[in-house]
């Protein structure tokens, strides 16, 4: 049975694209057939991870300009032979790259990618569509999922959505079975996550979708630590009651909580379980170029986190 998973966030900068791309690549490496869709049409970035500038995008399919087989690119061989962006002479990197034996032992998976057309014409066509065209595009969203299942026999459909509560991100969520609401442990993310859950996520879960909180870029892993104290980095809440109407967890400042307690409390408050909390790894976060960590550095702790995520799914 195909699983359709959408990575979403209330605001940008949560790392959802990194998580979506690495999850898709890891599943393909494990032998699954994976379709990866860039539906963040306002700020597409798959081209940075996969080093390709698409001519045709998935938004061209939604605009009825091409069929789905023209919008999906078979990227399996390119991923298998992905070259390191870090120079081979850089011996300071602490994690081993893929060995030849590891490459041979992998099962044969498939990875198709639906890039988003970066040209402004494609974005304007979607953004300025009239009501009748938007209804047709909604049908195309559903048709897209059906075609990826029937024609590509996908085991997984991974969607990177636009952040926020835009028309296109909501429709991306509507075709997904599993919704991963990605957030950081800051007041902007938590407040926005509360809005997203109350405004749209409860409607989806009411009709059978499964939603999870996915924490990313959690402080505390990188050494040396920041000048902020532990209590300053971790959100605080009042320990005995649920926040009242109009108040958020981060407005309550009576008792500091560690990450585990905070995650449990927010999940209880929103009625959505947390699936994973991923630390911030500075070597990835501050790299000058994007790359697929799970393929290049299978022993990296971030790769182990993605292993845990796909296993949980």
How would you label these PLM feature ranges?
Residues 1-4, 224-233, 310-313:
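Acidic-aromatic/histidine active-site loop/patch
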Residues 2-6, 35, 111-113, 155-158:
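Residue-level preference for the first positions of well-ordered beta-strands
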Residues 2-42:
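Walker A/P-loop phosphate-binding motif and the immediately C-terminal alpha-helix
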Residues 21, 299-313:
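Short, amphipathic alpha-helical "lid/cap" segments that border enzyme active or binding sites
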Residues 29, 138-275:
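Conserved catalytic-core segment of NTP-binding enzymes
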Residues 30, 277-287:
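Short, glycine-rich, amphipathic interfacial segments at transmembrane boundaries or analogous
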Residues 41-149, 286-292:
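P-loop/Walker-type NTP enzyme "switch/lid" segment
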Residues 286-304:
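C-terminal boundary of histidine-terminating zinc-finger modules
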């Amino acid at each position: 049975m195909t699983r359709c998973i959408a990575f979403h966030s209330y605001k940008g900068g949560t790392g959802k694209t990194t998580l979506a791309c690495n999850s898709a690549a890891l599943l393909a490496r494990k032998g699954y057939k994976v379709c990866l869709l860039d539906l963040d049409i306002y700020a597409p970035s798959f081209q940075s991870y996969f080093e390709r500038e698409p001519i045709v995008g998935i938004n061209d399919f939604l605009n009825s300009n091409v069929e789905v087989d023209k919008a999906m690119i078979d990227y399996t061989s390119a991923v298998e032979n992905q070259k390191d962006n870090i120079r081979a002479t850089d011996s300071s990197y602490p994690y081993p790259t893929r060995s030849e034996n590891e490459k041979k032992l992998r099962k044969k998976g498939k990875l198709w990618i639906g890039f988003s057309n970066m040209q402004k014409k494609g974005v304007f066509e979607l953004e300025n569509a009239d009501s009748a065209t938007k209804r047709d595009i909604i049908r195309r969203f559903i048709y897209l999922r059906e075609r990826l299942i029937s024609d590509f026999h996908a085991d997984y459909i991974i969607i990177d959505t636009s952040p926020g509560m835009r028309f296109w991100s909501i429709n991306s969520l509507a075709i997904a079975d599993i919704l991963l609401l990605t957030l950081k442990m800051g007041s902007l993310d938590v407040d926005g996550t509360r809005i997203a859950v109350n405004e749209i996520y409860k409607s989806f879960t009411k009709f059978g979708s499964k939603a999870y909180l996915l924490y990313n870029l959690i402080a505390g892993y990188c050494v040396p630590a920041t000048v902020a104290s532990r209590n300053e980095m971790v959100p605080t809440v009042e320990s005995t009651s649920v926040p009242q109407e109009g108040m958020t967890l981060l407005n309550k400042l009576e008792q500091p909580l560690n990450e585990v307690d905070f995650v449990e409390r927010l999940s209880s408050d929103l009625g959505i379980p947390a699936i994973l909390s991923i630390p911030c790894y500075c070597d990835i976060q501050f790299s000058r170029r994007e790359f697929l960590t799970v393929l290049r550095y299978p022993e990296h702790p971030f790769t182990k986190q993605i292993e845990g995520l796909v296993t949980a799914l």
